């Protein structure tokens, strides 16, 4: 014989309907709780359940299936914990990660798909709990401008695919680029960028950055890196390039860029939008940070705008003379010293300044749509490559075409 405590608080009885405020101690479906409440009504029909204080009934109920349900939930939770442990070890392949990373299921409902948490704010257990989360002492969702459960799943999933340390999502790829630059740079600092870039990125770096923010962008020829080492100065805060440039599809000498940058203590930031984590493993090639316009291949369905920046865990700002903003107390954010956060320094500062303060946040709905597209990334990229091969070879054989820029053609300098 097994028993289970059921707690029921009845708010109203109207034409046989029962409204329950709260059930506790077990994870029993609402229909089961409603049946229990009706049994109380049948036992005490004369009680007035509508007056305050609300009637509170606790009783013993012999129900074998409830105990079985609790046991099932315990097994499910153990399985979810094991899944989380395996994902943290990154022991799964790319296809599995793009489907499951960042989401362990909903233990409260049993839902296996990622829900759309379309909410602006969240509930707190107490005023102290809210204060601790707002100051960053405790983790949690406090406001969707800063963090949202749906967006967080997308961040964790992209981070797993990039084999990174932390990812922050933004409202667009351009917002992600500006956030990355302004996280590393203060007025008077410099950014080195290769010349072959997406038009919007080129306009921001070489047309707006110095004029509006006092940050100088130094341009280096993508096809000739001989001037890269000489261009690095005490003011240099990052070197920026695209893994596969948009739209010329040129490929820089990544090994030379990484070697030169690290010899001078400068982080390497790669726009991996065209390469994607599937075609280009930035971490394995020495890159320190990646960014994406998730609008393009990450999403793949043309329905959502977004961007992200991922810290790949290879560059440390602690004690670096190039980055005093990470090593000094930040009066604007509770005197936080970001370097003290270790591996979370870059993501935390970016989230504080560009989500909390500036509102560059990705909407939950865009994150939800992006997650749907991300599930097929590997299959889509394989087909993209097959299609691009066919088109490039067709054009290369055409007497009406003078030049084809495609790295997989034998005559390409990047082949």
Task: Write out the residue ranges for each language-model feature.
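Conserved N-terminal alpha-helix of the aminotransferase class I/II PLP-enzyme fold
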Residues: 121, 126-178, 200-208
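Short, positively charged and aromatic/hydrophobic N-terminal segments
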Residues: 9, 26-27, 37, 44, ...
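N-terminal glycine-rich, Lys/His-bearing helix-loop that initiates the first secondary-structure elements
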Residues: 84-138
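Conserved PLP-enzyme active-site core in the AAT-like
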Residues: 90, 98-107, 167-397, 405, ...
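Glycine-centered tight turns that cap/initiate beta-strands
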Residues: 163, 400-403
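Extreme N-terminal basic, low-complexity initiation segments
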Residues: 2-9
């Amino acid at each position: 014989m097994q028993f289970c405590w059921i707690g029921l608080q009845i708010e109203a009885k109207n034409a046989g309907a029962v409204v329950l405020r709260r059930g506790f101690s077990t994870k029993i479906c609402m229909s089961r709780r409603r049946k229990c409440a009706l049994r109380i009504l049948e036992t005490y029909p004369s009680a007035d359940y509508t007056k305050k204080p609300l009637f509170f009934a606790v009783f013993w109920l012999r129900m074998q299936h409830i105990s079985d349900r609790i046991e099932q939930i315990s097994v499910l939770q153990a399985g979810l914990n094991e899944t989380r442990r395996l994902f943290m070890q990154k022991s799964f392949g790319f296809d599995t990660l793009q489907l499951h990373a960042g989401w362990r299921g909903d233990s409260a409902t049993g839902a296996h798909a990622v829900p759309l948490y379309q909410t602006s704010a969240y509930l707190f257990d107490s005023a102290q709990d809210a204060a601790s989360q707002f100051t960053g002492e405790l983790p949690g969702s406090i406001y969707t401008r800063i963090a949202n459960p749906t967006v967080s799943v997308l961040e964790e999933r992209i981070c797993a695919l990039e084999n990174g340390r932390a990812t922050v999502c933004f409202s667009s790829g351009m917002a992600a680029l500006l956030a990355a630059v302004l996280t590393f740079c203060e007025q008077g600092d410099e950014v080195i960028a290769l010349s072959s870039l997406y038009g919007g990125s080129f306009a921001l770096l070489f047309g707006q950055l110095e004029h509006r923010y006092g940050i100088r962008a130094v341009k280096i020829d993508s096809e000739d890196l001989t001037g890269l080492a000489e261009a690095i100065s005490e003011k240099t805060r990052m070197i920026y390039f695209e893994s596969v440039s948009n739209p010329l599809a040129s490929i820089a000498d990544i090994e030379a860029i990484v070697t030169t940058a690290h010899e001078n203590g400068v982080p390497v930031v790669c726009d991996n939008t065209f390469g994607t984590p599937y075609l280009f493993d930035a971490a394995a090639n020495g890159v320190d940070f990646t960014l994406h316009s998730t609008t393009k291949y990450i999403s793949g369905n043309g329905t959502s705008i977004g961007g992200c920046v991922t810290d790949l865990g290879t560059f440390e700002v602690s004690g670096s003379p190039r980055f005093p903003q990470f090593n000094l107390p930040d009066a604007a954010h509770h005197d936080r010293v970001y370097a003290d956060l270790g591996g979370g320094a870059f993501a935390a500062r970016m989230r504080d300044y560009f989500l909390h303060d500036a509102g560059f946040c990705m909407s939950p709905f865009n994150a939800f749509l992006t997650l749907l597209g991300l599930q097929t990334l590997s299959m889509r990229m394989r087909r993209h490559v097959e299609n691009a091969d066919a088109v490039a070879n067709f054009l290369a054989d055409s007497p009406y075409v003078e030049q084809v820029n495609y790295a997989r053609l034998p005559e390409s300098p990047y082949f």
